[in-house]
Amino acid sequence: SGSASKDSSSDSGKTVIKAATGANAKPYVYVGDDDKPAGYDVDVLNAVFDKLPDYELEYEVTDFGSVLSGLNSGNYQIGVNNFSYNEDRGASYLYSYPYDKISYVFVTKKGGKEIKSFEDAAGLSFEGGTGISVSNAVEAWNEKNPDKAINITYSDADTSVFLQHVADGSQDFTIIDLAMYNSYMEEFNYDVQKNDIPEDEAKMIAENSYAYYIFPQDQKDLREQVDKALKELKEDGTLTEISKKMVWSGYCTGG
């Protein structure tokens, strides 16, 4: 299909909103058994659009980099990828009202060296996605501490692959958020262990610990409508109800 503009309309006369996702961050957003995007981020956004009858929401699964470039080109109107906030991205995109809170963990092989800080990881190998906040944090550490650099392998593989590589020893560690860790461990029970990332170091990953939907700069009106709906969903307890269905020990801003 051709690129959608914000004015494209469906047969029903509704404005079609295309939401793009990398769909590889379970339990937040992933491809479900029916080959459609599923997870907390998707359930929340669907609940938002239930309150916005003038719009028809469509999802497109693509790689992480294409989510961002597609927002810039106007192909997509919303990015759905459990986005954290950072200044660079904040200058390029509009952010929604936060709908979730995140905490990050270092993941290492069970029984091996525990990593409790970036300092502990000096000289070790890390695997992560290109352009995602945890990889950016490792890059920032390396720039500031060239004598304690961490070896980075970039991959667009699913997070489960990163955990498998840590478990089999081909990578020393990865960094993911706690809810994802719990979700993958419940499903696969990898031979790995976790340590919480200290709060001061977590700020290297994200300037705050919330998750957001992102929009192109020209979608201020859509962002306002989404924000209004998100606040209503928080106040009426819907966000908490959706989070209870997820496999995690998490805190949602609805809770």
Where are the regions that the model predicts?
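Periplasmic-binding protein-like
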Residues: 22-24, 100-108, 188-230, 249-255
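Ligand-binding clefts/hinges and TM-proximal coupling segments of bilobed small-molecule sensing domains
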Residues: 55-58, 133-155, 192, 227-255
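Extracytoplasmic small-molecule ligand-binding "clamshell" domains
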Residues: 6-82, 155, 245
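Short helices/loops that flank or line small-molecule/ion binding pockets
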Residues: 50-54, 60, 65-79, 92, ...
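Bilobed "Venus flytrap"/periplasmic-binding protein-like clamshell domains
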Residues: 23-27, 37-50, 105-160, 178-182
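Extended ligand-binding regions for polar small-molecule ligands
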Residues: 42-52, 112, 119, 123-132, ...
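Acidic, polar ligand-binding/catalytic clefts
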Residues: 46, 58-120, 193, 199-206
